[in-house]
Amino acid sequence: MAKSKFRPLHDRVVVRRVESESKTAGGIIIPDTAKEKPQEGEIIAVGSGARDESGKLVPLDVKAGDRILFGKWSGTEVKLNGEDLLIMKESDIMGIIG
C-alpha cells in the first residue's frame, strides 16, 4: 500500500528543482547534455524541526511553497510518485528567494 504523501523527518525538506532556461539571453539554445542541474527549487514538504541542546523543538525557517537556493552538491536525489525530487537538511539551503 503506497502512500501518496511523503513527510520528511526532523530538519529535512523535500525540494522540487526549478528548471533553468533552455535559451541564453542572446538566443542560443542550450542542449540538455550541456545544462547544469539547477540550484534553485521550491520546497514541497518540511519536517517538524530539529531539537536544541535542551531537547526543545526548534521549527524550521522555511515552509512549503518557498523558493530557495541550495549548493550544487546538496541533498539526496529521490524519485517519489514518478517525480525527481531532492531531500536535504535545512542547513544545506543558502537562502529564500523573494
Swiss-Prot record:
Gene Ontology MF term list: ATP binding; metal ion binding; protein folding chaperone; protein-folding chaperone binding; unfolded protein binding
Keywords recorded for this protein, A-Z: Chaperone, Cytoplasm
Taxonomy, superkingdom: Bacteria
GO CC terms, sorted: cytoplasm
Annotated compartments: Cytoplasm
GO biological process: chaperone cofactor-dependent protein refolding
Family the entry assigns: Belongs to the GroES chaperonin family.
Quaternary data: Heptamer of 7 subunits arranged in a ring. Interacts with the chaperonin GroEL.
Protein's job: Together with the chaperonin GroEL, plays an essential role in assisting protein folding. The GroEL-GroES system forms a nano-cage that allows encapsulation of the non-native substrate proteins and provides a physical environment optimized to promote and accelerate protein folding. GroES binds to the apical surface of the GroEL ring, thereby capping the opening of the GroEL channel.
Identification of the protein by name: Co-chaperonin GroES 4
